[in-house]
Swiss-Prot record:
UniProt-recorded name of the protein: E3 ubiquitin-protein ligase RNF12-B
Enzyme class: transferase
Main location: nucleus
PANTHER family: E3 UBIQUITIN-PROTEIN LIGASE RLIM (PTHR45931:SF4), SI:CH211-59O9.10 (PTHR45931)
Transmembrane residue ranges: none
SUPFAM superfamilies the UniProt entry points to: RING/U-box
Organism: Xenopus laevis (African clawed frog)
Catalytic activity of the protein: S-ubiquitinyl-[E2 ubiquitin-conjugating enzyme]-L-cysteine + [acceptor protein]-L-lysine = [E2 ubiquitin-conjugating enzyme]-L-cysteine + N(6)-ubiquitinyl-[acceptor protein]-L-lysine
Biased composition (Acidic residues): 245-313
Subcellular location: Nucleus
Biological role: Acts as an E3 ubiquitin-protein ligase specific for ldb1, mediating ubiquitination and proteasome-dependent degradation of excess ldb1 in a RING-dependent manner. Does not degrade ldb1 bound to lhx1/lim1, nor lim1 itself and thus contributes to the establishment of proper ldb1-lhx1/lim1 stoichiometry and the formation of a ldb1-lhx1/lim1 complex. Interferes with Spemann organizer function and suppresses secondary axis formation induced by ldb1 and lhx1/lim1.
Repeat found in the keyword field: yes
Documented EC number(s): 2.3.2.27
Length: 757
């Protein structure tokens, strides 16, 4: 009973508070209308043009009067803003400004006077950096804002981001893996994991391939054969480094150098994991089967089934079951490598067996984005057939990887992560270890010593694309990049972008596997942009959110809410925002640093929209069809997920709820209309419409916009169609629309209307 009473009291209090807030809002609205009605034309236009009226009910009459006085006297804000800009340039900007939309608007408006400035700050676990570039000739400037979410391991992950961003750049696995090993090493965890991944890559995969119990036998055969296959299969390992560069053939010639005992020793050490892997062998047999039907009967059947689909793979699978001996495998491996290029497409189409899927899941787990990133190059150079397929299509890779396993093991060293077909991985590991041996035995040793690190090490390599997976604890923080372009708007100028009303286009770019939302709007949903001060109109040119990175970091709900709040505060002044939402999978390796560091250069971002979001993730061999989503809520679609799976492995994009940042779209207030017809009138066009004061005949008439009766003192605006409205109501409407709210007739004849397109 007591609980019921308390509940009743609580609900009563809540309803009372709601009632009171509604009453207060109504009072403020009434005061707003009275204030506007009492303004003369000059004062009204002054406040309207400077966006000082705000929204009815959200501001008191006293505040409106204060704003009017300030604008008449000449706002002191410019000086404070300038000082703000100066402090920003000196790096003294207080973090408070970042959370205040007005302060940023003021700053934006003053930047054109102060020149290039940079602001940075930190709020809690969120660090931000704002950079502006001014064109002294035109007065236009571009503004870039980056928000980074730092976690406990955020600092470590940040460097990894930079490296990872660069990592994608190298096309060759060798380059990327080695470079990563070198670059990643800088991050304490990353270096080891990265180095290990390269050499560990195989060892690691070997460890996981351990599931490749078969690989174990394979690994041993390889290690045994490695002496032999080292020449033959080792070449593949070298090819792994080189394969990255795409030269698999070279791997054959270099086998001798690769054969360096390291590959053999590493395989030996790998064998230890192999013993461990044997348990795993059951899960990974799928991929292993092809390489070594002996290790696991299951794997043998799978290989057979998979191989059958893959004509090339079959030969390998045949050798695997029949010629379990490594010797046979080596030859097939080389053959596969040569044939691989041809098989790539085939395998992709083929790899679809349940086993492959298992391998795929497994691959996702152990696979790291870097590897994936590296994989694409490897695919080209190395047994691009199996590994390329694996890298680009984990599914395909998984399916064909088994078949390729032996071949890919060598080539797959780089793509072993993706394939994660344990057998392949081992072979790759062996080969890779051998290749690594040539590169650096220490790395291979590391791999051997830490086979388990394969998952983590692979992740490190993947770090560049999705650090969260790569470093485990050291996940790279999500980055939000906002690109704004501020233009000087002169009287008479009327371009589509300058229109307060806007149109939004939604398009997807298949080649980049990206989801893109593009808006061109010169104003905002509200009648007048809050940033329209002193003749400056601010609009968002692009906003890019790296969905992939966000997903990989696995943000907690609390963190995402905090970021959303911060973004909303920052965006408040920008009204309706247009944004680009790129899937990180389409990351362009050529522009790795744009997204990762909080200090990304705004100019680059502006010029290369995709570069910002671009994470060092390898583009899947077969581009995933871009997915369009409403307000970004459904960005994670099957296609996107497929893409994500290929590049990031463990992370899945299936649940849209797992993309907390996508909900940020609601703050951007996207207009979903796809019509390209111009909408909205300029202030000059609106002012040219006739107006009149309230008359006795208007006593019982009602404004159709606010649904409020006209009262004495009201100012009415009359449209050509003879319909009348409150001046402030219809002005707001016409800023976004060009038709009468009642009859929907065009307010301006097409001939008299300036071209908006």
């Amino acid at each position: 009973m007591e609980s019921a009473d308390s509940t009743g009291k609580g609900s009563t209090e809540q309803s009372e508070s709601q009632r009171q807030s509604q009453m207060d809002r109504l009072d403020r609205e009434e005061a707003f209308y009275q204030f506007v009605n009492n303004l003369n034309d000059e004062d009204y236009r002054l406040m309207r043009d400077n966006n000082l009226l705000g929204t009815p009910g959200e501001i008191t009459k006293e505040e409106l009067l204060q704003r009017l006085q300030q604008i008449k006297e000449g706002p002191p804000q410019p000086s404070t803003e300038e000082t703000r800009g100066d402090s920003v340039s000196t790096g003294e900007d207080p973090a408070e400004d970042s959370s205040n939309g007005d302060s940023i608007i003021d700053w934006l408006n003053s930047v054109r006077q102060t020149g290039n400035t940079t602001r940075s700050g930190q709020r809690g676990n969120q660090s931000w950096r704002a950079v502006s570039r001014t064109n002294p000739n035109s007065g236009d400037f571009r503004f870039s804002l980056e928000i980074n979410v730092n976690r406990t391991s955020g600092t470590a992950s940040m460097p990894s981001l930079d490296q990872s961003a660069e990592m994608p750049g190298p096309e060759d696995m060798e380059v990327s893996s080695q470079g990563e090993a070198e670059n990643v090493p800088e991050p304490e965890t990353v270096p080891e994991s990265i180095r290990e991944p390269e050499s560990v890559d195989e060892p690691v995969s070997v460890a996981e391939p351990v599931s490749v119990a078969e690989p174990v036998s394979v690994a041993e055969p390889e290690s045994v054969a490695e002496p032999e296959s080292v020449a033959a299969s080792v070449p593949v390992p070298e090819s792994v480094p080189e394969p990255e560069s795409v030269p698999e053939p070279e791997s054959v010639p270099e086998p001798e150098s690769v054969p360096e005992p390291e590959s053999v020793p590493e395989p030996e050490s790998v064998p230890e994991p192999e013993s461990v892997p044997e348990p795993e062998s059951v899960p990974e047999p799928e991929s292993v089967p092809e390489p070594e039907s002996v290790p696991e009967p299951e794997s043998v059947p799978e290989p057979e089934s998979v191989p059958e689909p893959e004509s090339i793979a079959e030969p390998e699978s045949v050798p695997v079951p029949e010629s379990v001996p490594v010797a046979t495998r080596p030859a097939p491996v080389e053959v596969t490598v040569e044939e691989a290029p041809i098989q790539r497409g085939q395998r992709r189409a083929r790899s679809r067996s349940p086993d492959q899927r298992r391998t795929r899941a497994r691959t996702d787990r152990s696979r790291s984005p870097l590897y994936q990133t590296v994989d694409p190059p490897i695919r080209r150079a190395q047994h691009s057939s199996s590994q390329t397929v694996d890298a680009s299509n984990t599914e395909e890779a998984e399916g064909s990887s088994r078949t390729r396993h032996h071949v890919s093991s060598q080539v797959h060293s780089s793509s072993s992560n993706e394939t994660e077909g344990s057998s392949r991985t081992r072979q790759h590991i062996t080969a890779r270890q051998q290749a690594l041996g040539t590169e650096g035995q220490s790395q291979s040793t590391v791999h051997l010593s830490n086979p388990e690190s394969r998952s983590s090490s692979q992740t490190p390599q993947t770090d560049s694309p999705s650090n969260a997976e790569t470093t485990g604890t050291g996940q790279r923080p999500p980055t939000i990049v906002l690109d704004l372009q501020v233009r000087r708007v002169r009287p008479g100028d009327y371009r589509q972008r300058d229109s307060i009303a806007n149109r939004t286009r939604s398009r997807s770019q298949t080649p980049n596997n990206t989801v893109t939302y593009e808006s061109e709007r010169g104003g905002f949903r509200r009648t007048f942009s809050r940033s329209e001060r002193a003749g400056v109109r601010t609009y968002v040119s692009t906003i890019r959110i790296p969905i992939r990175r966000i997903l990989n970091t696995g943000l907690s709900e609390t963190t995402s809410v905090a970021i959303q709040t911060m973004l909303r505060q920052i965006m408040t002044g920008f009204g309706e925002l247009s944004y680009f939402m790129y899937n990180d999978n389409d990351a362009d390796p050529n522009n790795p640093t744009a997204v990762s560091p909080p200090a990304a250069v705004p100019g680059e971002v502006q010029n290369n929209p995709s570069a910002e979001v671009r994470a060092p993730i390898a583009e899947p061999a077969e581009p995933v069809a871009p997915v369009e989503s409403d307000e970004g809520s459904n960005v994670a679609t099957s296609a996107t997920r497929r893409e994500g799976r290929n590049s990031r492995g463990g992370v899945t994009l299936e649940e849209s709820g797992s993309l907390p940042f996508l909900s940020l779209a609601q703050f951007f207030l996207l207009n979903e209309d796809d019509d390209d017809q111009p909408r909205g009138l300029t202030k000059e066009q609106i002012d040219n419409l006739s107006t009149r004061n309230y008359g006795e005949n208007d006593a019982l008439k009602t404004c159709s916009v606010c649904i409020t009766e006209y009262t004495e003192g009201n100012k009415l605006r009359k449209l050509p169609c003879s319909h009348e409205y409150h001046i402030h109501c219809i002005d707001r409407w016409l800023s976004e629309n060009s038709t009468c709210p009642i009859c929907r007739r065009a307010v301006l004849v097409a001939g008299n209307r300036e071209s908006i397109v």
